Regions:
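Active-site helical microenvironments for divalent-metal-assisted chemistry
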Residues: 1-250
Length: 250
């Protein structure tokens, strides 16, 4: 129900050439050089068959996630760090290489992203008996994510990456894992986006999370909204017609 027209389609595998062509028109000079350096490192060290938990090619995932990061206007080094967000998994001396190829600021951002990735991987929300306890645990996780980073852009990048994951999930079949990721998104990441005032990502995360968790209810609501939209447009057109006729009489 929330528009995704400003980003790539869920099923599209973004190539480095497409990515560079897109951002070459937006950045130049030192900023573009940083992004090109990050891309070269990712192309060198990400295995060709590397994929995310949901099956998206890793390089395409991080490149696609930068489109969401770019919407937040948090500078070129954040885009470069997003591209390199999986580098710690595949390269032991990634810190040295990142600092040499890019700069220390990007290295620190990638370090923060790596810490957040590990936290969310090993501290997922447990199945608890009462909704109150579940809510308390989710709130603790959100506070921890904010408290542990020295640069809030790390959390914003993580939100953008989760948004890309949710976006990509529209192209794959329903599964328990898909519903689990959707629930985690609704429990942790959508409220976190709300707390940080990142409204566009909040709406996307809530919309897609509900869609994957409750596809039948989502379809019913979407249909009702479409019907109401038709009624609203008909009403607006009628009002415009009345106004135009009255103006013609003047």
């Amino acid at each position: 129900m929330v528009s995704l027209t400003r980003v790539i389609s869920p099923e599209q595998t973004l190539t480095p050439e497409q990515w560079l062509a897109h951002f070459s028109g937006k950045f130049s000079g030192e900023d573009l050089a940083l992004m090109q350096g990050a891309l070269e490192l990712a192309q060198t060290y990400y295995p060709k068959d590397a994929k995310t938990q949901m099956g998206e090619p890793m390089l395409s995932h991080v490149l696609s996630a930068t489109y969401f990061v770019d919407e937040l206007h948090i500078f070129a080094d954040a885009l470069a760090a997003t591209v390199l967000s999986a580098l710690p998994v595949y390269c032991q001396n990634w810190q040295e290489l990142t600092t040499q190829k890019c700069n220390a600021s990007i290295t620190r951002l990638v370090e923060g992203i790596d810490q957040v990735q590990k936290l969310t991987k090993f501290a997922s929300i447990e199945k608890i008996n009462t909704p109150e306890e579940h809510q308390q645990q989710a709130e603790s996780m959100r506070k921890m994510l904010i408290a542990m980073v020295s640069d809030i852009r790390v959390v914003l990048i993580k939100l953008a990456m989760r948004t890309r994951t949710m976006h990509f999930m529209a192209s794959i079949p329903d599964s328990d894992l898909k519903r689990e990721i959707a629930k985690e998104t609704l429990d942790i990441f959508a409220p976190l986006a709300n707390r940080l005032g990142v409204w566009q990502l909040k709406w996307l995360l809530e919309d897609l999370g509900f869609r994957y968790q409750n596809p039948e209810a989502y379809s019913r609501i979407a249909k009702l909204l479409d019907e109401k939209r038709t009624e609203r447009m008909e009403y607006i057109n009628n009002v415009v017609g009345v106004i135009e006729r009255e103006l013609d009489r003047l």
